[in-house]
A protein has these predicted regions:
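Substrate-gating cap/lid alpha-helix
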Residues: 133-169
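Histidine-centered active-site loop/cap adjacent to the catalytic His
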Residues: 60, 64, 70, 180-207
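Hydrophobic positions in alpha-helices of CheY-like receiver
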Residues: 112-116
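A short helix->loop->beta-strand "cap" motif at the edges of active sites that frequently abuts
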Residues: 120-124
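Mobile beta-alpha loop/short-helix "lid" or hinge segments that flank ligand
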Residues: 87, 129-134, 167-176
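Surface-exposed, active-site-proximal loop segments in enzymatic domains
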Residues: 90-99, 134-141, 179-182
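Conserved SGNH/GDSL esterase-like catalytic core that processes O-acyl groups on lipids
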Residues: 2-111, 147-150
């Protein structure tokens, strides 16, 4: 049985035979930069993304096949750029434990990569590290720290195999001051544009 439909003329995402086809997966941070990435890569690439917040690693695992079936031909996707981390690392409602343990996170990243390889067989895979928290120490309802994020990023990178590329968005945002943040973890409009430009540059390097 095929993992996805081979060709779907009525699919929401119609792949181009001329341009690069890029699929962005991620949480609200991705939602904040995806429009800039699309603008920066035009006209060289078509940039696709679901409107949904892709939440945590478990959510990505359970929805990847559905998203793949939104493409006219998933085998024509050239690049899949993904991140999930903020939801996994968060201590929901201030609980003692993060949503996803370190061991579970590493396992889930491996599962996601394996699924991308099956569902998008010709795509280069880029893993984006999770971005930093507001350095002013603002505590959200679902807290996490930059130190925790750094640790989970290291765990994720250790799970990568083969030719998976790392786009280190943690490094991009690590020296940003609190003026770049709209709240405890989300960025201002201008900062999201800068993040989108950084993502676009990382994608261009794989063209």
């Amino acid at each position: 049985m095929a993992y996805v439909e081979n060709c779907n003329a009525n699919a929401q995402f119609q792949c181009s035979e001329i341009q690069k086809n890029v699929f962005l997966i991620g949480d609200s941070i991705r939602q904040g930069y995806c429009a800039t990435v699309k603008e920066e890569l035009s006209p060289d690439a078509q940039v696709f993304y679901v409107s949904d917040n892709c939440r945590n690693t478990q959510y990505v695992i359970t929805n990847l096949k559905t998203w793949a079936n939104m493409f006219s031909n998933p085998s024509m996707v050239d690049i899949v750029h993904f991140n999930c981390g903020h939801w996994d690392i968060a201590h929901w409602c201030g609980g003692e434990l993060p949503l996803t343990s370190e061991q579970e996170y590493k396992r889930n990243i491996k599962i996601i990569i394996d699924m991308i390889r099956k569902l998008f067989p010709n795509a280069k895979i880029i893993f984006a590290t999770t971005t930093t928290m507001n350095p002013n120490g603002t505590i959200g309802i679902n807290p996490r720290t930059t130190a925790e994020i750094a640790r989970y990023n290291d765990i994720a990178v250790s799970a990568l195999e083969g030719d998976v590329v790392v786009n280190d968005l943690f490094a991009v945002t690590n020296d940003w001051d609190s003026d770049c943040y709209a709240d405890y973890c989300h960025f201002t409009t201008d900062a999201f544009k800068e993040l989108g430009k950084a993502v676009a540059e990382a994608l261009k390097k794989t063209f």
